[in-house]
Structures are given as C-alpha cells and as structure tokens.
Amino acid sequence: SHKINLNGNNVTRKNTDITLHQNNADTTGTQEKITKDKDIVFTNGGNVLFKDNLDFGSGGIIFDEGHEYNINGQGFTFKGAGIDIGKESIVNWNALYSSDDVLHKIGPGTLNVQKKQGANIKIGEGNVILNEEGTFNNIYLASGNGKVILNKDNSLGNDQYAGIFFTKRGGTLDLNGHNQTFTRIAATDDGTTITNSDTTKEAVLAINNEDSYIYHGNINGNIKLTHNINSQDKKTNAKLILDGSVNTKNDVEVSNASL
C-alpha cells in the first residue's frame, strides 16, 4: 500500500502521480508515483483533489481513525476496490464513482455523499449520508452493521423498493426527519430497522403494497406509519403484515387496506 500523511494539507491525484502540497501557497508540492492495484492509505485528515478519471484496479482508499477528509473530483470519476473509513472519521465525498462499477464501503466511519453518483453502493459497515435526490441508483446493506441516513427529501430511488435492499442481517435506514414511501421493503430478515432519529420532526413511513406483503424488519423512533391504498373500494388483499418490532408513539394510519 501507499501511505500518505496529509496532516491537514492538500493532495492532488492525476494519472499515476500524486502530489502533496504542504500549504495553499505550495503550488509545486512533493510528487510520487502510485502503482495500480495497491491501496492508498490517508492519515491525519486533509483534502484530496482528483484531476483525472482514476482506476485503482484492485486497490482502494483507506482513511485512518478520528479525522475529517474532503474528496473533490471536479467531475472526474474514481473506480477501485472500495472505501474503508476508520472509526470516528468522516469523508465528505464530492467526487463521482464510476457508473460501470459498484462502490463498496466498509469500516465504522462515515461517508458523507454530497453529489449524485449514478452508481450502486454496497455497505458492510458504518454510516452513509445521502445529500442529493436519488444519490445512488441502488443501495445494498448486509451484516447489520451499516446505516443509511437521509439528509434530503427523495434521496432514495423511486421504484417500488425505493432503491434500497436489505440482504442477510440487513442494516438501518434512518429517515432523519424525511418522509419515505415504499410499495414493499426489500428486507430478508429482522436484521433490518427503519428509524427516525430526529426527535423534533416526525417522519412518515408509507408502505403502500396492494397485495399481501410481510415486512420482517423493525420500525422505531419518531415515525408515523401509514398503509393507504388510493382506491374507492377496500383492497381486501392489500394486507400489510408486520412480524418484527414496532415501537413508535405516533399514529398508525390505515385506509382501504388491512394491517
């Protein structure tokens, strides 16, 4: 792996060259070559600027613990093995991931995605904050250790599953004060939890299946649950079955359907 001690400074990456600038006035910087298929390890926080489309091959980007990083892409894309973010670190991601690949995010730290990606993401651990409408095409959570936090209305997809899929042991979706509608929630088991951590702003979780459907996961926090079918006739087959935990003090609203 290549280890780069940013120490709060700036680094630019173009082709195989990476240049460390000790301060804003340092326009020349210290340059070294980067080998494809090797990880880059950034330490001690700082700013990274992509100046070309980058393909790391089987290499990824590793960020150490307890620091903040700002990644900017100027419209260029990154492609590689994924992103590993250390505990209590936050990576403000203002770059693009390649649309012909899947971004893998691991590590307990936070990926704060500030630009619509046009790609898919798989989350094994840590937080991913969504700040744009339809931030990712599809989101996959597994193992129960990952969390997706909505920071904008409509930041998930617009298909029947809202573009988020909870596989074995799932993970957490934090509505964070934003309403969200599903036709069905793609949750494999009770490892999935949908919550609202915003204690001052109620979030509406609407599940509007028109055929019988079982949600195996959990619902908690400051959530109002609704199951409404837009039909003058009651849909007797539009049964929503909840066999996980539901723990909310807010209303549960059902119209033209069964719960």
Q: What residue spans do the PLM features occupy?
A:
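Beta-strand-rich extracellular passenger or scaffold domains
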Residues: 1-259
